[in-house]
Amino acid sequence: MKKGSIFLMMVGIIALHTSFRLPKYYPDAAHATKDSYFVVVTKSKYELQLFDGSTGEWISSYPVVFGSKDLGDKMMQGDRKTPEGTFHIIAKKSPHKWSRFMGIDYPNAESKEKFNIRKAQGLIPSNAKIGGEIGIHGVWPHEDYAIDQYQNWTEGCISTKNNYIQELFNLLPIGTTVTIQR
């Protein structure tokens, strides 16, 4: 009985660590345009999904973590929440302290409008700032376990394993659409 339980536990652990990503063929990354792919991040699933921009076909999924365990929308600078909405990759930095960094255009017009409405409604302090420098990045060297254990540790960014961010960094051009949803 004990051997059976241990076996099932090991199968479960292996499935958990391999279920997000299946090897997929990527179209020629060297010729990718901003419309070749799009990304959907679902915070409640701790998942980043990559889709083919022309067919809408799912390509691959990656495990991710965020800032706060409260998966609500970013309200203001310093709340450690990840913003929701439709954004675009506007910058790529390599090397970076977290392997690679792809900055998104937060705050954009939609984010600023939500922020100003919340401020006018008194939901956030009148002196609050909207924040910025949000992106998708890796983890500190040798700390991929933070992703496996769903440890939300960022200041509002999206973090994945270093080998995954390197793959995404090499594949996704500036201008790629990134939708972040709860």
Labelled PLM ranges:
Residues 2, 6, 70, 122-123, ...:
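Hydrophobic alpha-helical segments, principally membrane-spanning helices and signal/leader peptides
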Residues 95-182:
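Exported/periplasmic cell-wall-interacting domains
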Residues 3-5, 10-25, 29-30:
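Bacterial Sec-dependent signal peptides at the C-terminal "C-region" and cleavage site
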Residues 17, 43, 160:
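Functionally constrained cores in energy, signaling, and assembly domains
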Residues 26-135:
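Gly/Pro-biased beta-strand-loop elements
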